[in-house]
Structures are given as structure tokens and as C-alpha cells.
Amino acid sequence: MIEEQRTMSVEGADQQSEKLFHYLKKVAVELDETRARLREYEQRATEPVAVVGIGCRFPGGVDGPDGLWDVVSAGRDVVSEFPTDRGWDVEGLYDPDPDAEGKTYTRWGAFLDDATGFDAGFFGIAPSEVLAMDPQQRLMLEVSWEALEHAGIDPLSLRGSATGVYTGIFAASYGNRDTGGLQGYGLTGTSISVASGRVSYVLGLQGPAVSVDTACSSSLVAIHWAMSSLRSGECDLALAGGVTVMGLPSIFVGFSRQRGLAADGRCKAFAAAADGTGWGEGAGVVVLERLSDARRLGHSVLAVVRGSAVNQDGASNGLTAPNGLAQQRVIQVALANAGLSAADVDVVEAHGTATTLGDPIEAQALLSTYGQGGPAEQPLWVGSIKSNMGHTQAAAGVAGVIKMVQAMRHGVMPATLHVDEPSPRVDWTSGAVSVLTEAREWSVDGRPRRAAVSSFGISGTNAHLILEEAPVPAPAEAPVEASESTGGRGRRWCRG
């Protein structure tokens, strides 16, 4: 009897041990799976985002990324006199006296050719509705389509997909015009929220559609949000960028009162001769995708966005006054988000508006971050596309991104125009930072080319983004042949 009880006790213990073993084995497997999911989440949260397509329109006849590169690589200045086809009282607007009421002391800006042109039939929009549509909405439809074609993606294939649209836009002067007789389309035609929503509607996209207004930093903030959405899994593809079309000359009049404009309309970024900003306009969209997805789907990678950050000036010297410490912080956070150090970045496409207050503050922030610790013979290079085509406002950030993507692909850092000599308002000896007064070959030793882009909004919202050249050489750009599904638009709109 005692022996039987002992045997039963041993068997019971063995069964308990076996149960415990299987339980612990199950827990170990679940723990491994949890760790794997956590690693995947952490990797996705910091995964580089690929730029797989670009669409844009800018002054000087720029109708694609190759056109923009032609302008900046040739050192062209595309500023011109006020257009005569917008109904502006060009002669009556001008007065050299900055205090003249309702006048502007400049006749110059950088303007789009045929800013109101639009293929309404292709997009299936009735003529009566098109008349009520802000040209900015029309442009976003066209450059979004072009950007997808540039990426080799049939726009109509995305219907029902988790594709997001993030549009930087803040000027809505078209809505101030007489909209009588437009049959109720005025509200949707001039709403900045619809600039994103209309792209999603026309293409049938079901990811987030967000219009971003942080003034001059709008398009870079839009790209930052698109990156965050991709990394979180909220969307699988994103169209991000910005647009500005000056339907009325009110921004010239307003900034003339503040004496913030250059009389000749030229942005002389970081120059001793800097005397104010010059206004421009344009539209740009980049197609963004998680790098792992771009590789899996065989999409050409034009460049990689390694990291980005957005912050606010807070209580600075004034609502519209830049905050140098906040600019330093946004740079540091963007570098941390990218997993890089300041020494890993070769060039910064600066905000560089050529104002006597803003440029010195921005330069000092760059000197205090990127300019420290590196050899003087290998400085951080600084430039600004605003010297070519003015301050394109809500499209300024994406213009800088496109410029830097193209510069990395061509291996050249373009010159910044109108710099007679570096600004004496900046202590350039406090760090290793130099202005690109001439084009330079972009040579690197055993690592990828990297660039940063800055945008600062007049409301105090700052953005900074870190770009890296594509991990493998991208194939030469070629127009996407139109298919039956694109109705022939591929040949017409994919212009490089």
C-alpha cells in the first residue's frame, strides 16, 4: 500500500512537472513572439522612408524635378515682373514709398506660367465647378497625378488603398474674389481643407487627407506628418507637399508695410546685401513609402528620408520673431530621430529668406549645431533655393527637398545666388559653416550623401528633415508610358 502511494505520488509529481514544463515553454514562445513584435514596432517607428516619385511646378517653366534641377544647377534667377494676366492693377500697385497705403514698393516676384490652366475633362470636373476651384486645388490634383506616374504607379490602381494625402497650404486669396454665379461651388472650391480631400476623392484614396497650415513651414510639416503616418502603419503610401498661388497681390502690400521685401524681388540669403525676402509660388509633391515596402514592390528609390522633427518657438521675442534656441532643438531632435550625428550631414538647404533678422538667427543656430566639432576644411555647406525663385511660401519646404534629392542624385551642391559676401551680422568664425557661393562637387568617402532641409513658419512652427541618397543607384528617369487606364495623361503630364 505504501509502495503504491509512493508510486502515485511520483507519477503525480511527474505530471505536474510536465505541465509546468509545457506552460513555461508556452510562456517562452509567447515572450519571444512579443519581443519580435516589439522589435518590429521599434524598427518601423524609425524606419527610413523612401522618396519614390516627384511632381512639381515652379517659376521659370519648371514642370518636374528635372526642370527644377536645370534651374538650380545652371544658377538661373527666375524672378520676373508682376504678371499681366491675373487682373492685377500692375501700374497702380507700385509706389517706391514703403508707407504708401495700399501699395507695394516692389514690382518683382517669381510666378508660375499659366497658373490657372487645368485639364478639367481629364479629372471629370464640370466647367462650372472648375471656375470656383482655387488654382491651388487644381495644381495639387495635377502634380499629385504626375508624382505617382513619376513613381511608376498607375494613379487609378490606388482606389480604396490606405494612401494618405498631406498638403501644406495657407494662402486662399482666390476665395476673396467675386464668386457670384458659381452655383454653390465656392465653399469647396476655396476651402484649404479640400485641397487634400479633393485629391483623395478623385483618386479614391482612403488614408488620411490633411491640409497643413503652419505658414512658411507648411509643406515640410506635411512631409513630417506623412512620415509619422507611414511609420505608425496608418497609411502605406503618402502624397506629401505643398502649394501656393498668389491670386491677389495682397501679400506684397502687407509685407511692404513691414518693410520686409527686397525692392528687386531677389532673396539674397545669408549675404551682406540681404535686404528682405522676395515672394514666389509653386507646387510640389513627393510620393513616400516605407523603404522596406519600396524594395519589396520594386519601386525606384530616389532618396531616403532618415528622420524629421517639428517644434515651436514658444514665448520668443515676438510672435513672428525666430527663436534660435528652438531652431537648435528641432535640428537636434531630427538628428536623433534619424539616428545620426551632426557630422553625418554634408549640406543644409536652409530656410534662408534673406531678412536681416531671420538669416543671422538661422545661421547662428546652424553654427551652434552642425558647425561644432568638425574640421574647418570640411564645413557644413549652406544654401537656399529662394535665391533662384523667391520664397514659395507653403511650397518652400518641398521645393528644398526636391532640390536636395536631385543634388544627391547628380553629385553636385548648387550655388546660392546673389551673395556678394557672407553676412557680417553672423559670426562665421564660431563654427565650421560656409555658404555655397559657387557650385561644388559633392564627393563623400565611403558613406552616403546626406542633406538636411529647414523650414520656419511665421507663426513659430519649425521643421527640420534629414535626407540620404538612395541605397542603390536609381535608374535614369523616364516618362511612364500612358496606359488605357490613364487615358493618355501619362504622356502629357509626366515631364520629368
Curated annotation (Swiss-Prot):
One of its GO terms (biological process) is glycolipid biosynthetic process. It holds the Pfam family ketoacyl-synt. InterPro entries: Ketoacyl_synth_AS, Ketoacyl_synth_C, Ketoacyl_synth_N, PKS_assoc, PKS_Beta-ketoAc_synthase_dom, PKS_NRPS_Biosynth_Enz, Polyketide_synth_docking_sf, Thiolase-like. Keywords: Transferase. Residues 474-485 have a biased composition (Low complexity). Residues 46-469 form the Ketosynthase family 3 (KS3) domain. This is Putative inactive phenolphthiocerol synthesis polyketide synthase type I Pks15. It comes from Mycobacterium tuberculosis (strain ATCC 25618 / H37Rv).
